[in-house]
C-alpha cells in the first residue's frame, strides 16, 4: 500500500503525501516497483522537480540508483524529455552524462531515440555529451534520430559529429538504411542531398536502403531513391534477392506495380526463387495476380524443384495455389480474367504496407527475431533480414527415440497421402459391410384403421458421423496458423518509440524459417501432442535451404523505458495500444513464435523434424485448370461474365480498399478486361466480336439478340454464356414481326445468308414490302462489315502490342483507350445533333400542316427543302 501511494504521489507531484509517508518511516531505498525503480525514477520521468529534489535532498534516496535495466533517474528524464529534471540530476544530483544503462545507452541516446531535440541540443552544447559513443549494438545517437524521423535532432547530431552519417551498426545498418526502413522521406532526402549519405552501403546480409524500403512497403521513399539517388532496380542482396522479391513477399502491391511499370525485371535469386515464389509462399494473392499478368513464369521451379503454386499449396494458401494453377494454361492476355471467384472472405489477406501514406496496413501475423534490423536498436548486433540463407544451420543433435517416434507419427498424421482411405488414393475401395441380420422377434401389428406401414428399407442404417478425415484435419491445421495470434500481433509494425535497446540474447540466428502453416490447432485429436507442438512451431522443409522472405523480430527486454508513462498499479500487458514486444517483454529470453512463447533452450535441443509429406506426383505436370464457378445467367445478356467491371463477383482484393484492382496496371486501365468480356467464341482478344448480331429496323434503331449457346472445348477455363431467351414474350419485334434469334457473327471465310435473317411478315401477318426488306438487308450487311473490319484492326493492334514490355504496352493501350473515348464522345455529340435536327424537321412539318405519317420519304425531303410539294 505504501509503495503504490509513494509512486502515485511522485508521479502526480503530491508533496504532502510524500512527507506523510516519510514521517511514518515508509520511504526508503527498498521501496521499489516491479522493475526495481524508486520513487525518484517516477518523479524524474514525470517532470516533478520539486518532488525529485525532496526525495533526494530530504529523504536521502540515491539519485544515482539504477533500475533493473541499469537506468538511472537521468535516463528516465532524458527518455521522457523533461529537461529541467535532467539538468538538476546532472548538475546537482550526482548523475553523469556519459553513464550507460545495461544496453550501453547514454542519456543522449535516449533523447534522440524518443525525439526530444531540446534535450539533445542542451546535452550537445552545454551538457558535455559525446555523440560518438555507441551502444552495445554499435548504434550512435544519429541512428536513433534517423529511425525516429526526428529531423531537428538529426541535424544537431550531424553538425556535432558528421562522421556518423555513414556509420554502421554491428549488423551494418546505416542511418539512411533505418530512415528508409521506417519510411521517413524527409530524413532520407536530408541524408542523401545535404549529408552525402551513401545509398549503396549494405547491411551484413547485403540489403541496401532500397531493399529496406521495398520490404516495408514505403513506396514514396523507394520512388525517391530510384529517381534521385542513382540506385538500380537490379541490386541484389547476398541471397540474390531484389527489391521486387521483398515487395512481393510482404504483399506490397503498390510497390510491386510501380517496379513493374518502370521496367524492373522479374529475376531469380540464388535459390532459384522468383518474386512469384515469395508471394505465393506467403499467401499474397494480389501480388501473384500482378506478377502473373506481367509475364512471370508460372512453371519456373526453384532449386528444390518447387513452382510457386507448389509453395502456396505447401504452406496452406489454397487461394493462391488455386489461382496459379488456373491461369497456368492461359495466355498472358487472358490471365486478367482468371480471378479466383471461389475465394472466401476469410481467405483474403490485407495489404501489408506500412507507415507509407500510399500503402495500407497488414494484419498478417509475423514472428520476431532478435537479430533483425527492423526491430529496435537492441537488435542491431546481427542485422540480418529474414531473407539470409539458412544453409548449414540445421541441428544434427539426436533426440530420444520416443520423442522422435512421436514427431514422426505426428507428421504421418498430417500427411494426407498416408491418412486418406484407400479409395481416396485411386485404389479400389473395400466392399461395404454386409447388412445387419433381421431382428429375431416379429414386428408389432399395425394399429387398426390405418394403412399398413411401408416395408423396411433394404439397405443398412447409416453409420454414425465420425470426425473429420485426417486430410481435412491436415488442411485445417495448416490454415490455422494465420488465426493464432494475440491482439498485439495485429499491429505488425513495432514502433521504435515503444521499445528500447537491449543486447540481444537470442541464438544469433536471424530470419524466419519456412514454417508449417498451422501446428497450433487445438483439436481434440491433437491435444495430447500439445507439448510436441510447442517445440515444433518452427518446422521448416527439410529439403529446402531457401528461407521465407519475411523478416522477423523478437521482443527486446527494454520494457522499462516503454512503461515510463504507465500508472504504477497498471499491469504492463494491459495498457492499451501497447506494442507486441511490450507484452512479450515480461518473458525475457523466451522466443515468441506466432503469438506463443516457446522455451528457447528446449527448442534448441530439438533437431529438425522429419520432412513434411511429399507433393503429389501429379503436381509435376499440372492437369488442365478446372472451369471457374458458373455465375447465374441473365435472361437478356449474351456476354461473358465480367470479372472486375461488374459488382456481381466477389472482389479478390484482400486489402482495405473495396475497389477492384486492375491486374495490368496500377493506373486502372481496363482495356484488356473489356476486350475479353466482349470476346466471341475463341479466347483471342477480339473486342468487336461481341457474340451479338445487330438487326436494324427501318427507323435505324438497333435490336440486339443474344447468341445461341455454342459448345466450347478448351483446356483453358471458360465462362458460361447466358442461354438464348425463350421466344415467348422476350424477343424484340421488328416492324411488328417476331425476329428469329440469329446466329453469332460467322468466322472469317464462312458465308452467312443475311437476307434470311430479315422477317417477311409483320406482327399482323402481312408481308413486308420488298424494298423495305432490301434496305434492312443492306444496313445489316454494312454493319457486319464494319464490325468485321474493326475486329481485324483490334487483332492487329493486340498482336503488335503483345511483343512490347508490359509497362510500355500498358502506356500505349491507355493512349489508345483515350483516343477511343474521344471518338465515342464525338459520335454521341453527332447523334444528339441528329436527334435535335429530326425534332426541328418534325416541328416544321407540323407547322406547315402536313401529316408526317402519310408522307413518303422523297416528299418529306422536298417539303423540308422547298416548303411545299411541287404540283
Swiss-Prot record:
Residues 428-465, 606-629 have a biased composition (Pro residues). Pfam families: Ank_2, WH2. It is found in: Cytoplasm, Cytoskeleton; Cell projection, Stereocilium; Cell projection, Microvillus; Cell junction. One of its GO terms (biological process) is locomotory behavior. PROSITE patterns: ANK_REP_REGION, ANK_REPEAT, WH2. Expressed at high concentration in the microvillar parallel actin bundle (PAB) of hair cells stereocilia in the cochlea and vestibular system. Detected also at high levels of a number of other sensory cell types, including taste receptor cells, solitary chemoreceptor cells, vomeronasal sensory neurons and Merkel cells. Isoforms 2, 3, 4 and 5 are expressed in Purkinje cells dendritic spines. Expressed in utricle hair bundles (at protein level). Gene3D superfamilies: Ankyrin repeat-containing domain. Multifunctional actin-bundling protein. Plays a major role in regulating the organization, dimension, dynamics and signaling capacities of the actin filament-rich microvilli in the mechanosensory and chemosensory cells. Required for the assembly and stabilization of the stereociliary parallel actin bundles. Plays a crucial role in the formation and maintenance of inner ear hair cell stereocilia. Involved in the elongation of actin in stereocilia. In extrastriolar hair cells, required for targeting MYO3B to stereocilia tips, and for regulation of stereocilia diameter and staircase formation. Jerker mice have a frameshift mutation that affect the espin C-terminus. This mutation cause deafness, vestibular dysfunction and hair cell degeneration. This is Espin. It comes from Mus musculus.
Amino acid at each position: 500500500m505504501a509503495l503504490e501511494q509513494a509512486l502515485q504521489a511522485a508521479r502526480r507531484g503530491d508533496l504532502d503525501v510524500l512527507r506523510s509517508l516519510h514521517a511514518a518511516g515508509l520511504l526508503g531505498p527498498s521501496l521499489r516497483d516491479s522493475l526495481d525503480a524508486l520513487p525518484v525514477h517516477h518523479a524524474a520521468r514525470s517532470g516533478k522537480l520539486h518532488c525529485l529534489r525532496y526525495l533526494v535532498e530530504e529523504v536521502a534516496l540515491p539519485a544515482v540508483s539504477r533500475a533493473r535495466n541499469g537506468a538511472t533517474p537521468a535516463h528516465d528524464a532524458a527518455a521522457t524529455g523533461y529537461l529541467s529534471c535532467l539538468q538538476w540530476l546532472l548538475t546537482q544530483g550526482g548523475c553523469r552524462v556519459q553513464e550507460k544503462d545495461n544496453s550501453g545507452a547514454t542519456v543522449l541516446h535516449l533523447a534522440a531515440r524518443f525525439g526530444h531535440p531540446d534535450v539533445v541540443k542542451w546535452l550537445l552544447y552545454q551538457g558535455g555529451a559525446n555523440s560518438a559513443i555507441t551502444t552495445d549494438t554499435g548504434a550512435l545517437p544519429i541512428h536513433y534520430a534517423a529511425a525516429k524521423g526526428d529531423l531537428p535532432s538529426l541535424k544537431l547530431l550531424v553538425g556535432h559529429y558528421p562522421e556518423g552519417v555513414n556509420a554502421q551498426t554491428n549488423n551494418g545498418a546505416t542511418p539512411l538504411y533505418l530512415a528508409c526502413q521506417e519510411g521517413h522521406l524527409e530524413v532520407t532526402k536530408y541524408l542523401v542531398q545535404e549529408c552525402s549519405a551513401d545509398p549503396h552501403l549494405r547491411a551484413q546480409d547485403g540489403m541496401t536502403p532500397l531493399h529496406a524500403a521495398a520490404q516495408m512497403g514505403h513506396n514514396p521513399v523507394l520512388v525517391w531513391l530510384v529517381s534521385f539517388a542513382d540506385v538500380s532496380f537490379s541490386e541484389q542482396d547476398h541471397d540474390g534477392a531484389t527489391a521486387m522479391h521483398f515487395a512481393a513477399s510482404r504483399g506490397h502491391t503498390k510497390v510491386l506495380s510501380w517496379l513493374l511499370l518502370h521496367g524492373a525485371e522479374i529475376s531469380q535469386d540464388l535459390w532459384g526463387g522468383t518474386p512469384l515464389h515469395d508471394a505465393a509462399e506467403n499467401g499474397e494473392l494480389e501480388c501473384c495476380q500482378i506478377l502473373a499478368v506481367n509475364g512471370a513464369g508460372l512453371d519456373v521451379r526453384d532449386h528444390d524443384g518447387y513452382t510457386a503454386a507448389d509453395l502456396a499449396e505447401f504452406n496452406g494458401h489454397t487461394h493462391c495455389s488455386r489461382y496459379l494453377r488456373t491461369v497456368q494454361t492461359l495466355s498472358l492476355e487472358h490471365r486478367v480474367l482468371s480471378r479466383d471467384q471461389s475465394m472466401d472472405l476469410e481467405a483474403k489477406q490485407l495489404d501489408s504496407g506500412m507507415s507509407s501514406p500510399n500503402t495500407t496496413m497488414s494484419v498478417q501475423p509475423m514472428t520476431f527475431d532478435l537479430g533483425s534490423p527492423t526491430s529496435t536498436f537492441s537488435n542491431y548486433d546481427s542485422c540480418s533480414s529474414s531473407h539470409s540463407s539458412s544453409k548449414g544451420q540445421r541441428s544434427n543433435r539426436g533426440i530420444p527415440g520416443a520423442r522422435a517416434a512421436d514427431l514422426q507419427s505426428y507428421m504421418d498424421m498430417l500427411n494426407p497421402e498416408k491418412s486418406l482411405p484407400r479409395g481416396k488414393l485411386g485404389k479400389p475401395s473395400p466392399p461395404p459391410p454386409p447388412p445387419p441380420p433381421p431382428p429375431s422377434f416379429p414386428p408389432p401389428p399395425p394399429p387398426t384403421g390405418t394403412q399398413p406401414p411401408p416395408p423396411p428399407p433394404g439397405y443398412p442404417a447409416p453409420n454414425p458421423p465420425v470426425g473429420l478425415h485426417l486430410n481435412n484435419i491436415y488442411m485445417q491445421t495448416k490454415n490455422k496458423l494465420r488465426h493464432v495470434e494475440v491482439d498485439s500481433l495485429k499491429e505488425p509494425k513495432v514502433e521504435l518509440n515503444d521499445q528500447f535497446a537491449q543486447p540481444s540474447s537470442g541464438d544469433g540466428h536471424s530470419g524466419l524459417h519456412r514454417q508449417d502453416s498451422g501446428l497450433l490447432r487445438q483439436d481434440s485429436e491433437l491435444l495430447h501432442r500439445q507439448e510436441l507442438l510447442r517445440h515444433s512451431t518452427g518446422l521448416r522443409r527439410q529439403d529446402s535451404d531457401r528461407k521465407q522472405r519475411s523478416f522477423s523480430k523478437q521482443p527486446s527486454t527494454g520494457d522499462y523505458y516503454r512503461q515510463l508513462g504507465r500508472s504504477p498499479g497498471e499491469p504492463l500487458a494491459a495498457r492499451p495500444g501497447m506494442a507486441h514486444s511490450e507484452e512479450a517483454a515480461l518473458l525475457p529470453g523466451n522466443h515468441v513464435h506466432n503469438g506463443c512463447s516457446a522455451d528457447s533452450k528446449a527448442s534448441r535441443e530439438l533437431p529438425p523434424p522429419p520432412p513434411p509429406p511429399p507433393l503429389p506426383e501429379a503436381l509435376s505436370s499440372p492437369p488442365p485448370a478446372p472451369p471457374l464457378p458458373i455465375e447465374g445467367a441473365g435472361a437478356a445478356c449474351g456476354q461473358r461474365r465480367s470479372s472486375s467491371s461488374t459488382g456481381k463477383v466477389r472482389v479478390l482484393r484482400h486489402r482495405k480498399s473495396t475497389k477492384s484492382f486492375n491486374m495490368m496496371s496500377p493506373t486502372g486501365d481496363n482495356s484488356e478486361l473489356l476486350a475479353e468480356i466482349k470476346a466471341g467464341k475463341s479466347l483471342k482478344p477480339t473486342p468487336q466480336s461481341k457474340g451479338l448480331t445487330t438487326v436494324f429496323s427501318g427507323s435505324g434503331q438497333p435490336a440486339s439478340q443474344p447468341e445461341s449457346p455454342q459448345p466450347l472445348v478448351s483446356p483453358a477455363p471458360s465462362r458460361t454464356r447466358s442461354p438464348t431467351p425463350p421466344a415467348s414474350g422476350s424477343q424484340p419485334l421488328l416492324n411488328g414481326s417476331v425476329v428469329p434469334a440469329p446466329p453469332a457473327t460467322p468466322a472469317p471465310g464462312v458465308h452467312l445468308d443475311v437476307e434470311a435473317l430479315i422477317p417477311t411478315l409483320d406482327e399482323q401477318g402481312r408481308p413486308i414490302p420488298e424494298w423495305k426488306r432490301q434496305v434492312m438487308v443492306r444496313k445489316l450487311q454494312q454493319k457486319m462489315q464494319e464490325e468485321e473490319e474493326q475486329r481485324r484492326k483490334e487483332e492487329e493492334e493486340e498482336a503488335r502490342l503483345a511483343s512490347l514490355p508490359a509497362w510500355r504496352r500498358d502506356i500505349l493501350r491507355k493512349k489508345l483507350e483515350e483516343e477511343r473515348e474521344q471518338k465515342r464522345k464525338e459520335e454521341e455529340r453527332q447523334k444528339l445533333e441528329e436527334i435535335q435536327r429530326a425534332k426541328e424537321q418534325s416541328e416544321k412539318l407540323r407547322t406547315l400542316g402536313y401529316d408526317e405519317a402519310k408522307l413518303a420519304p422523297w416528299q418529306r425531303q422536298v417539303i423540308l427543302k422547298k416548303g411545299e410539294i411541287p404540283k
